[in-house]
Amino acid sequence: MKTLSSLLLVLAVNVLLIQASPDPDNRCPARKYWNERKQACVCKRENRCYPIGAIFDPESCTFSMCQSKGCSAKQIFNKDKCACECRNDQPKDGCGAGRYWCNQDCSCKCSTPMSAGGCSGSQIWCEKSCACVCPNADKCTAPQVWNKDTCCCGCPVNMQEPADGCTKPLIWDKVDCRCECPLKKDCGKNRDWSDSSCSCECKGDGKCQGSKIWCKNNCRCICPTAEPAGGCSAPLKWDDDKCSCACPAKMEEKKEKCVESGKIWNPNTCECGCAQLNCPDNKKANKETCQCECKEVKKCNGGQVFCKDSCSCVCPGGDKDKTCTAPQVYDGVACSCSCPVNMQKPADGCPRPQKWDKEECRCECPVKHDCKNGKVWDETICQCICPRDAPVCTAGKERCGESCECKCINREPKEGCAKPLVWNENTCKCVCPADKQMSPGGCGSGKSFNKLTCQCECDQSASKCGLKRWNADTCKCECQPGMPPEGCGKQTWISDKCKCECSPTITCQAPQILDLNTCECKCPVNMLAQKEKCKSPRQWTDSKCLCECSTTPATCEGKQTWCGEACQCICPGGDKNCGNKKFFDKPSCECKCKNNPTCTSPQVWDADDCECKCPKDKQKPQGGCDGGQKWNDRVCSCGCPVPRPDCTNGQIYNINTCACGCGIDKPSCPKQQIYNWKTCDCECPNGMKEPVGGCGAKTWLDDECQCDCVPGKPKGGCTGAQKWCDKTCKCKCEKEMPTGGCENNKKWCDETCDCVCPQKNTCIAPKVWDAKTCSCICVNPPKCNSPQVLKDTCCCGCQNVKSCKAPQKFIENICDCACPNKKQCKAPLVWSDEFCDCVCPNSASMKTCLSPKEWNKVTCTCDCNPPKPDCCPGTQKWMDDKCKCGCPNAQTDCAGGKKFNDFTCSCGCPSGKLDCTGNTKWSAETCTCGCGDVNRNCGNLKNFNDNLCQCECKNKQEMANCKSPRTWNYDTCKCVCKNADDSDDCVKPQIWLDDQCKCGCPASAQMTCPANKRFIEKSCSCECKSPMPSPIPQGKKWNEDKCVVECANVKTCEGPQRWCDNQCKCICPQVNTKCSDKQKFIESKCECGCETQTQCKDGFRWSNLECGCLCDDKKCPGKQVFDKNTCQCKCPNQKPGDTCGNGKDFCPLDCSCKCKNPKPANGCTGVQEWNEEKCQCECPKDKPKKQCPGGQDWNNHQCQCGCPTPAPTCSNNQKYSNVSCSCGCNPGKPKNGCPGNQIWCDNTCRCVCPKNMEKPADNCKTKWWNDEMCQCVCKPGCPEGGCKGVMKWNANTCSCECPADKAKPASCGDKKSWNDDSCSCQCKSKMPCGGCPPNQQWNEKDCECKCSATGNCPAGQTWNSQTCQCSCPATGKCTGAQVWCSKACKCVCPAQKKCDSPKTWDENSCSCQCPKNMRPPTGGCNAGRTWDDATCSEKCAATPKCDSPKVFDPTTCGCKCGNKPNKLDAGRTWDEQKCKMTCDLPAIPCCHYEGQVYDSNTCKCGCPKEETCKQGFSFSPKSGCKCILECNKKDPGCGAKKIWCQETCKCECASEPPRMGCGPNRYWDKEDCACQCLKTKVCTDSDFSFFSHDTCDCECSNAKDFILNCNQKLNKVSCQPQCIQRPPPEGCAEKFGEFFSWDPKACECKCIEQKTTVKGRVFDKATCNFKCTNEPKTNPKCANTAESWDSQICACKVCSTCKH
């Protein structure tokens, strides 16, 4: 039931999914269905079966017996007409004027082709517009516009080159359509380019500061005196501001530091001077610090540090710090105690759980325990284990780790064995007691002894009894009750079913069935009803239960069929009335002609009308015969009447029109000429004939029907300023020479059409040539102020330059000598024009100051330098004569070892009073600590210590080196072992080692063990690290030397097999033994192959993968198809005896019938084409016979309609139309249509205005009538488009008006008035003539001068509206150490100090601070780190001691590998714990090639060693790592994926098999050199199913089309998404609530929001249920404690079952 309900549920979900999703079949028409993989409608399978010879049409999914033919790409085959038709329909409105529809190309074509001379100029022929057009797009960059005649861009009419050319030196630019400079230069930083003069002009105003003068040539201020010729002496550099040699500006800071440090600054060398230093050989003098420093600062290794005194690397500490305990030795590089080289820690570390003992320099167990219960201690694993030589436990038992005894693996159950079983310790099972055991065969037949129940039981079970009952005594199935006493009657007793039934031997033939009551065969009840309806001539048959004819059905003739109702042969439609000419033939059931005569060709017999008629392809045209031709029924064609007329005037007789004509349909005349059908020649139209008086200066061109200049305008145009005159066909000047001749000695030039200078002189820069005055002039010369004058350099300068005496300089502004930088001097200093500086007034009589005082140029007095401090240190006083602080009573000698103290100015101990150690005391007289009266006799081994006032051992070095496990004996002054009493406990071969204070092996027994062994201290010998396993696998043995289990017998392998040490046998290397279904694995070849190979038939090939012959698809010629059964090409649906019919033969290559009589050699007549189907000439399909328009007739040879000849004569204003075959307007409607809004009128043959746009009765009033536009317009001469200012033209009012966004306001205010030209309010008063005051600008809005800048002043400053500037107050408030600076108008530090990097100066605190990005973190430093304020960074709180090769890492404050390389080798990774490189992939157990082994260093397989081979042999790693014969063969060409291996002398795969094999269900194919699937599948479950060679399974091609959520997965059978979790069996509503429903997209039960409303309730989506709208939000919800809230009635009610 569960299975049925789940199936019904799935069916219901699928129905919902089908209903929810749109029906894909609705997208497709009948006979088709939607294919998801192809994303298109395809034919259904039931519509794909068709009869032999039929043609299937995939568009309509139908079949036709018509043989399709090859149509062009634009055509499609019509099976109804059995012919090609256009895919696109002919345009409804036709192809347009001058174009016709072409059925062969399925497109519109031009009626008149391109003229013989082609298109003019750069134009090309356009098939769409049937006219000559430009090939390139009309995209021109402004201001150029497009020219349709020349097909190129050019300047517009209003932007043409001036008639007299551009004013020099400007030239015309054809791209920008304007006059520009011929070449624009880069003027540099001091000049700007001028587009008016085409030259560079100076930027500045010509004013210079200081002693510099302005130079017009260089456009900059320069020094009056130049830099010395040889330059300044190094390191001095020329100072362009001071105009003299001086130290570079960057050395000013260096100079200040030099002066502050007390050194001497040399202005000539720009360096600080030091006193002479005498440095050793390994040191050099530092001029900056004036000290001796090491010449080379070495980078020390390990723990060494660099000593600046000795200039070498040394270990820190004294000799005591360099003493190590055995066996450690002191490392002079690492500066620490470490193990010797032969006792280093293993590279792979100690075997676990052993740990490395740094002091003992060996691997030891961390703790050693005493073993109990028969266990022994294992030094390798550091545990107590059971003895390894203990015997193996019997089956079902294992050795217990606690007692080392064999105990049962399965313990006795806690509740004991099930009764009557008891526990047996030997067998470890619950067994029957001995008194209840039964011997074999003791239970009798049919029974056996059950060891679980300890009793005899039946062998067979009661499950086989079915309807019978089981008898446990007899162990048999018995019927109960048995057969009835009265018997079964006609039925038989069935003992297996224990009931009476009909005998199974009785069988009834269909359709009869067995009657269970009578056990007889009878017809079914539903078929007996037909027996009553059975009437004559049919009879009822009981055996068949049918009403049928008594006689068997006769074989009917022809199309007659047997009728079961009448029991005779009849025609399907009965007899027909065939008329007079036909009779009814019963065998064929058809009407046939009474007479069947033979028709004369080309007539054929018409079986329908029973008479001879013309064939369908030779029927009389619907519109009759063309021209004057008439129809002939006997020959079935149109022809001209006889006799034919004689033609004149060069005309010939036309058999198509049966009249005389020119003999051509489409004449080709020059562009302007027309064809004269009377004279059969081309001629110019009447309005374009050659003038009677000739063309004058021009020549008549007959092809163009016009007069033109020959030769025409020159290709390059007219020279100079001349222009082409079309009337005279010559170039000439528009401007004539002046009547009075040229001025300023100029001459007239016909080329330029202007007066020019006779010669142009070369001007010296910066002067330029002036073409007006024909002389050199300055461009924009400056106005020079007195006493300066204008020079030839076009600059203002002095006439005479004086030579001034230093330090005065020549000032060019005043043209005289003066001081360049005169300034105001502070008292008592005064200004001196002689020195150009502030000097003392008595500088001439300056006094000579006594040393150490110096002359002060500021105070003009002798002062101390440095000056007197505020206070002297200690008790010192200021000595003005010496200019320093000192003691006036200074002494040189003091009594009792005392020294004079300059700070206190008195005698005293040099070090002051010291804290004495030990028993010593301080003496103020001797200034030392002493012992006083103490016994100083200490013996030979000891000395007296004056510091401690006691005796101590002499050998202090030995005492300092005495470390654990030794101790120092102060009485004997010796280092002795703490455990010296343990020397008697040593067991041989160990002895007491006094240097190590323990029992150990003697030196003679010490040895270095191999890598696979370790040294055992107890036995003083080497033993294997890994113990011998027990038991040893079969076929292997233990090697004590190598400490490994190895193969007992190593064999030599044959073929591709190689020896594997793991399995001790020859195996195939890295080969998957799982082969495909039809292949078997061949051990000798190590590959999958076939057991036997047979010879394949022609066309078939042998497949090693399928182990059989396969047929490959081939491309057959022509229309032949490939037959996989015979593997041959043959024609489809061809049967023996097939014929093509009359007039055709079968062609096996094309599989089609071809005409016996080929196409005529000269082709078909006229425009007719050959029809391969009918084997005759006929009109092409694009020119089928049609109903001709107007009076035209059909021409069968030309396959087109034409007018009858001769044509009628038209009136003067009309002409004959070849389309309507009638007279019409001459000339007709203009080609470009009527101008403006006019329309064409056929009655008057001219363009007229429409009725709704006729001229008004008032004659447009003030406007003029435009006949072309059919509307009233403004009178000409009005300024349309030429309004002043921003005003625009209004076509309605015919006047200039202001735009809507600039309408005139009601008022402009007091200061402004309205201006019509600008359409805006303008100021009444203008800006003052002299301009606005400084810093002010004219404000157009307020009509007055205002400050140009805003009044936002910096903090502390105020705004002055008169001067438009910010001003600073005299005083201000500052915080901290800052003071107020009125010049800078801010608080500043009184002094600034240079900070040591990385600290910077902080203006707020006036001190050096760490930068903001280098401050201590807010949360404090990380664990193990502290803040260093000197470096503004974190540092490690402690430096750990790292074991080599690890080193200290300051970033993590821990240890890291110091030997880690920057780049790892390929295929390797870094082990941070072991500090070495390891392989990134697991080791290869068995290498691919024989003899190779896996190398953990290279992570690859390779030969253990390489041999040197003799001549003629070479070493081969791929052939057993041995010498083999050299290969003499050459590369035969191995093909794709393979290369020639000279080493193995054969083709091998270019790529090796994957390192770890191909993986499951895949194997390595040596032929394809790739991993292949073991089995392939045919994936046809879905249209999207395909077999993937990557996964070796069926996959879906539409997997990317679905975006699956977490609850969905893709079903690979249907290739459709399905839910991972199925809907609950009981349904969503039953499980979660009545409003829950299954969502197939989300694959979960979702709440369905209810839109229906319930009175007093609202739907709550959170609970997915209706809740009461009046439910209280308080708790408790009911005020009365005796009541509770009832959500069913939405009210409080008394609760009868609640306890309150």
Curated annotation (Swiss-Prot):
Chief place where the protein resides: secreted
Keywords associated with the record: Repeat, Secreted, Signal
Compartmental location: Secreted
Signal peptide: 1-20
Note on domains (UniProt): Has 82 approximate repeats of Cys-x-Cys-x-cys.
Function according to Swiss-Prot or TrEMBL: Used by the larvae to construct a supramolecular structure, the larval tube. Balbiani ring protein 3 could play a role as a transport protein that binds to other proteins intracellularly and in the gland lumen in order to prevent these from forming water-insoluble fibers too early.
Protein name: Balbiani ring protein 3
UniProt organism field: Chironomus tentans
This protein's encoding gene: BR3
